[in-house]
Regions:
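Amphipathic alpha-helical interaction motifs in eukaryotic regulatory proteins
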Residues: 65-68, 72-75, 86, 139-146, ...
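Conserved structural core of kinase catalytic domains
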Residues: 42-49, 58-61, 68, 72-134
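C-lobe/activation-segment region of protein kinase-like
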Residues: 124-138, 144-237
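Conserved long hydrophobic alpha-helices within structured protein cores
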Residues: 17-19, 33-41, 76-86, 150-160
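Residues on conserved beta-strands of the protein kinase catalytic domain
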Residues: 34, 99-103, 193
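Short coil/turn motifs at beta-sheet boundaries
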Residues: 13-15, 31, 97-99, 187-189
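ATP-binding glycine-rich loop module of kinase domains
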Residues: 1-73
């Protein structure tokens, strides 16, 4: 297998992984899409300031093990609420004395992350209708993932992708009554299909199906929703 990197994507708050779209040239014995997302764990590019406090190799190993275990637990949600996971492996970097990096291969989920749709410094321009709908669906996704024992500790808007919406861009439809709402023409509140990505910073718990049961989930959401409405899209949590 060989990989050709294409476009650099936003990464996580951890500085070890570099995230790219990639063309995958697989051998005859490997079955996977030709276009995936590659998360490259390379301690050489770890932030210099952070190496004063953390061993980059420990951070790399911890990040990889967290992601792999998360995707193992989340197999039933792969392809719907989380990306499909196609494995991880070590690879040698050409022209760098065969230096080894570790790579995770993931489905490239179409859509945009919520931070790109609602930049934190413009979150106050989002109307209450849109904010309520976005936060509600994001929290339902959080608890659906938690039901499988994966407690996301990096629950930020950058880690939630909104899939393409059927009626957006097809016509100049305004999806709320607030004329100056930042996403009035860009987000259909009735068609919010979200995917969670990035499981480097998680806590693993016992699976608990009650987190995905509608009544129980609604109770849990109502307890934390006011805080999320005030601060989440502004990266204030």
């Amino acid at each position: 297998m060989s990989i050709t990197l294409d476009k650099r994507l936003d990464g996580s708050v951890d500085r070890v992984p570099h995230v790219w779209t990639a063309h995958v040239h697989a051998g005859a014995t490997i079955t996977c899409p030709s276009h995936l997302v590659a998360k490259i764990y390379d301690p050489v590019f770890f932030d210099d300031d952070e190496t004063r406090y953390d061993d980059p190799f420990y951070r790399r190993d911890h990040s990889i093990s967290s992601e792999v275990e998360a995707y193992r637990r989340l197999v039933p949600l792969q392809g719907t609420k989380v990306p499909r996971f196609y494995g991880h492996f070590a690879a040698m970097v050409p022209d760098q004395d065969s230096r080894t990096v570790f790579i995770l291969l993931l489905e490239e989920v179409p859509g945009r992350d919520l931070r790109a749709i609602v930049p934190p410094d413009e979150a106050k321009k989002v109307c209450s209708k849109h904010k309520e709908a976005i936060v509600d669906v994001a929290l339902r996704l959080f608890f659906d993932v938690r039901a499988y024992g994966v407690d996301q500790q990096d629950m930020v808007s950058r880690n939630i992708i909104l899939r393409p919406q059927k009626h957006v861009s097809a016509s100049p439809t305004q999806f709320c009554d607030t004329e100056r709402c930042l996403v009035a023409l860009d987000v259909d509140c009735s068609d919010l299909d979200m995917v969670m990505v990035d499981f480097e910073i998680v806590d693993f718990k016992e699976p608990d199906p009650s987190f995905s049961e509608q009544a129980e989930q609604r109770t849990k959401i109502e307890k934390i929703k006011p805080t999320y409405l005030r601060r989440w899209l502004q990266n204030g949590l």
